[in-house]
C-alpha cells in the first residue's frame, strides 16, 4: 500500500465514527503483509486457511457466471482474477503495489490485467465492466472510504451489471473466530477490520451506492474448519451445510446487486 493511501486510511480511521478509546485498534500497516501471502495460502491446497480461500472464491465465481468482463476491486495478489481468467475477461485493481507486482508476475498472461491504483484512477480506455467483485475489502476501510470506493466502482459497472461483494458478518460468531485466529495465526484481523457490518447495514450500503435487487446471504460456517480432517471431508461438509444452515450461521456475507439501467 502506498504511503499516501496508508496515511489517508489512518487519518480517516482516527477521524471516523470510532470511539477513540484504548479498545480501538491502531491503523494497520498493510505493507507488512508479504507479497502473495494469501495467494500462497490458497495454492497450498491443504489446511483450514487454504480451504477457506477456495470455498470463498468458488462461491464468488459462481455468482459471476454469465458475466463476461469482470473487474475485481481490491484484488490483492490476483487469486480470483487467476480463477476467472479461464472463462472471463478478468482484471484486478488494488492500491498495494507489491501485491499487484506479484499478481502481474504470477497471473497476468496478457498484461496489463492488473492495476496498482484506486478504482477511480483506472485508465478511461478500460471502459465499463459487466460485473464487479469486491472480496473481503470493505471491512478494511473506514466507512466513508468504503462508500466512496463502492460508488467509484459502480461508476465502472455497465447498466444492468452485477456487483458481488463479501465481508464478515459481525452479528455472527465471526468476532469470536477472528480473536481465535488472531491468537493462533500471524495476521491480526481485529486490527485490520475497522468497518464491522451486519446484514442490515450491508443492504443499506449497497442500496445507497445505486444498486437494485440487493440480496445479502451468508456462507462459510463449519466447512473450512473441517479441512483439518481432510480436503474432501471439508467439501462434503460444505455441501451439507449449504443453504439453510449457512444462511443462518454463516460467518461471511455475500452481497449482490444490479446497477440500475
Positions of predicted regions on the chain:
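Conserved N-terminal segment of class I S-adenosyl-L-methionine
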Residues: 2-127, 131-133, 147-150, 218, ...
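A short hydrophobic/small-residue beta-strand
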Residues: 90, 163-164
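Short catalytic micro-motifs in class I SAM-dependent methyltransferases
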Residues: 136-140
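A short glycine-rich, Lys/Arg-flanked "PGG" loop and its adjoining helix->strand segment in the class I
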Residues: 147-159
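Conserved class I S-adenosyl-L-methionine
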Residues: 164-184
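A C-terminal cap/extension of S-adenosyl-L-methionine-dependent methyltransferases
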Residues: 178-182, 204, 214-261
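Acceptor-substrate binding/catalytic loop of class I
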Residues: 185-201
Amino acid at each position: 500500500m502506498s504511503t499516501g493511501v496508508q496515511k489517508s486510511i489512518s487519518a480517516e480511521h482516527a477521524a471516523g465514527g470510532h470511539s477513540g478509546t484504548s479498545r480501538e485498534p491502531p491503523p494497520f500497516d498493510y505493507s507488512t503483509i508479504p507479497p502473495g501471502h494469501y495467494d500462497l495460502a490458497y495454492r497450498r491446497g491443504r489446511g483450514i486457511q487454504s480451504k477457506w480461500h477456495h470455498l470463498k472464491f468458488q462461491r464468488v465465481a459462481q455468482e459471476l457466471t454469465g458475466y463476461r468482463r469482470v473487474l475485481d476491486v481490491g484484488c490483492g495478489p490476483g487469486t480470483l482474477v487467476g480463477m476467472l481468467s479461464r472463462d472471463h475477461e478478468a482484471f484486478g485493481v488494488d492500491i498495494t503495489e507489491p501485491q499487484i507486482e506479484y499478481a502481474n508476475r504470477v497471473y497476468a498472461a496478457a498484461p496489463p490485467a492488473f492495476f496498482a491504483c484506486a478504482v477511480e484512477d483506472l485508465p478511461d480506455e478500460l471502459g465499463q465492466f459487466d460485473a464487479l467483485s469486491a472480496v473481503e475489502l470493505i471491512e478494511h476501510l473506514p466507512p466513508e472510504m468504503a462508500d466512496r470506493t463502492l460508488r467509484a466502482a459502480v461508476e465502472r459497472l455497465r447498466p444492468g451489471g452485477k456487483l458481488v461483494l463479501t465481508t464478515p458478518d459481525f452479528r455472527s460468531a465471526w468476532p469470536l473466530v477472528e480473536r481465535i485466529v488472531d491468537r493462533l495465526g500471524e495476521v491480526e484481523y481485529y486490527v485490520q477490520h475497522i468497518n464491522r457490518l451486519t446484514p442490515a447495514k450491508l443492504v443499506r450500503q449497497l442500496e445507497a451506492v445505486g444498486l437494485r435487487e440487493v440480496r445479502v446471504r451468508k456462507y462459510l460456517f463449519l466447512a473450512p474448519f473441517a479441512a483439518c480432517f481432510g480436503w474432501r471431508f471439508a467439501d462434503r461438509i460444505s455441501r451439507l451445510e449449504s443453504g439453510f444452515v449457512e444462511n443462518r450461521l454463516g460467518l461471511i456475507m455475500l452481497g449482490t446487486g444490479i446497477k440500475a439501467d
